Amino acid sequence: MIDSFYIAWRYVAFNKIRTATLIACVTLIAILPLTLELLLTESEQQLLSRAESTPLLLGARGSALDLVMNGLYFDDEIPELVSMAAVNELEDSGLAMPIPLYVRFNARRFPIVGTTLDYFDFRGLTIEQGRQLALLGEAVIGAEVAGRLDIAAGDSLVSSPETVFDLAGIYPLKMPVVGVLKRSYTPDDLAVFVDVKTAWVVQGLVHGHEDLARSEDASVVIDRTDSNVVASARLVEYTEITEENVDSFHVHGEPDQYPLSAVIVIPNDDKSAAILRGRYQESERLHQLVVPGTVIDGLLANIFRIKNLLDAVIFIVAIATALALTLVFTLSIRLRQREFQTVFRIGGSRLTIVRLLVSEIAIIMAASAVLCGTALLAVDHYSSDLVRMLFIR
């Protein structure tokens, strides 16, 4: 049998292109369903663990899936916005603790998450380097952001404009990075956290500039009265918040009407949760209160229905590939009749021919198994990042 393996090995080594093609076909057919299973299992674990740890999520009426994906996984799809009035209403009810979220802007392709310090306690996030948020304009970044951008506490990060040509004249905000979070293996690793007021600064709702009442620049001040000062377009807003200008930052309009993308709602107990869900089921309400776990269950059900369809397609392709491989080996036997005749002449039997063919198939299957195993180990190692890239973000 060892002689048969040696002869088969020399044959497959000589016919490199044919052997490589057969190995590639077998490997692809084997690895596709296994990789899909690995990624879907990891995605289910990541999606459900985050969703089930979030009791309730408040947002504007519309797509519950968009709300959950933005509020929990910081997806780029921005849901309909709510206002700070929704947070105040929840606080006044005394039934839950609200945590506001404003996930709309980016900094070098990483989402800027405007929130409060309660969010870090809720998610169990701790600082590994530097300190926690303390002042307007400061940022704390996730471990993955720090690694990919090579940024540490003490560096700075600039917000990205929503469009290339920003006609609204909103300037990018330079944010000092005061802390780096300990790796949590969640979407929080890929986020830039700021105070919710800082997110409003990025949008231009809160801004700072020089004191017009003291300005003597005629090109900046158009008109001045005892009660009002009118500024021209030459008035430049600050693009960085420092100790010197932080007091000049102010709001325009009512803060209760300032936007949020979602509100995490942590009810006091099950009874409080039931009361709140009942209140927000009323049709005249402009807001919806969803259970993230239920929404993600629906998403996963759809994903696994698609997986079943893909499995059926892969199964059909596998059958077609097996038939094609059988045809290749059958034709190979016909083309190698002279070789087999030589084996017979030197005293070999039909069993020897069978051993040679079985050895060739075994070598091809073994090589395919090694490649498949190596690829699956790589997929398993990077499955968390792959799931975030393919399914979550």
PLM segments and residue spans:
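Hydrophobic, regular-secondary-structure patches
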Residues: 37-111, 118-121, 135, 252, ...
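Beta-strand-rich non-transmembrane domains
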Residues: 103-108, 129-140, 163-186
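Mechanotransmission and gating elements of multispan inner-membrane complexes involved in transport
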Residues: 171, 180-307
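Glycine/proline-centered hinge or cleavage motifs at structural transition points of membrane proteins
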Residues: 340-342, 347, 353
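Short, membrane-interfacial amphipathic segments enriched in basic
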Residues: 1-6, 286, 351
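Short juxtamembrane loops and helix-capping segments at transmembrane helix boundaries
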Residues: 379-393
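Short beta-strand boundary microenvironments
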Residues: 109-157, 255
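Hydrophobic alpha-helical transmembrane segments of multi-pass inner-membrane transport and secretion
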Residues: 14-43, 304-340, 362-378
